[in-house]
Amino acid sequence: MAREGEGGGRGGREERDSEFVDRLVHINRVAKVVKGGRRFGFAALVVVGDQKGRVGYGHGKAREVPEAIRKATESAKRALIRVPLREGRTLHHDVNGRHGAGRVVLRAAPAGTGIIAGGPMRAVFETLGMHDVVAKSQGSSNPYNMIRATFDALQREDSPRAVAARRSLKVSVLQGRRLGGDTETAAEG
């Protein structure tokens, strides 16, 4: 008999975890040199998201591939960030990010554009729940640097509400400026 308020034991945890979608971005065979030779293991890079604006990435190492993926997934779930999305489908504004020699440019796109992104960035946008974005990667094509540069860019993304609060403005005034309809200059022109 399941106790009330605990989600039915282990089943409650499984239901909570099922809200996340994970994508394996990269798997790498690594070697540790020891006295008797080399010990081989695996390193996994995983991206996890809820497809509603939260996403995280994690890195896990183990002697077997499934264990490395499990560790990376747990690490990603502990490192989730929230990204504000416009209309639940794209970015509010264009943004750049960098990590090491990896640079990425993320651009907001009109509805119906789809995810135009290469390699590891596509996994980030799919797990984030973004439907329309144009992304370009420059410099390093190392998946670790591309993921970190993408997350750097996503953390720079601000919603109009956050920008308005920072500037002590109303959101409607800020939106009017974005659309080019400042009321005072429109009356003069």
Swiss-Prot record:
InterPro entries associated with the record: Ribosomal_Su5_D2-typ_SF, Ribosomal_uS5, Ribosomal_uS5_bac-type, Ribosomal_uS5_C, Ribosomal_uS5_N, Ribosomal_uS5_N_CS, Ribsml_uS5_D2-typ_fold_subgr
The S5 DRBM domain, residue ranges: 20-83
GO cellular component, one term: small ribosomal subunit
Gene Ontology BP term (one): translation
Matching Pfam families: Ribosomal_S5, Ribosomal_S5_C
UniProt KW rRNA-binding keyword: yes
Keyword entries, A-Z: Ribonucleoprotein, Ribosomal protein, RNA-binding, rRNA-binding
Role description: With S4 and S12 plays an important role in translational accuracy. Located at the back of the 30S subunit body where it stabilizes the conformation of the head with respect to the body.
Subunit structure: Part of the 30S ribosomal subunit. Contacts proteins S4 and S8.
Annotated HAMAP family: Ribosomal_uS5_B
Record note on domains: The N-terminal domain interacts with the head of the 30S subunit; the C-terminal domain interacts with the body and contacts protein S4. The interaction surface between S4 and S5 is involved in control of translational fidelity.
Family note: Belongs to the universal ribosomal protein uS5 family.
NCBIfam families associated with the record: rpsE_bact
Name of the featured protein: Small ribosomal subunit protein uS5
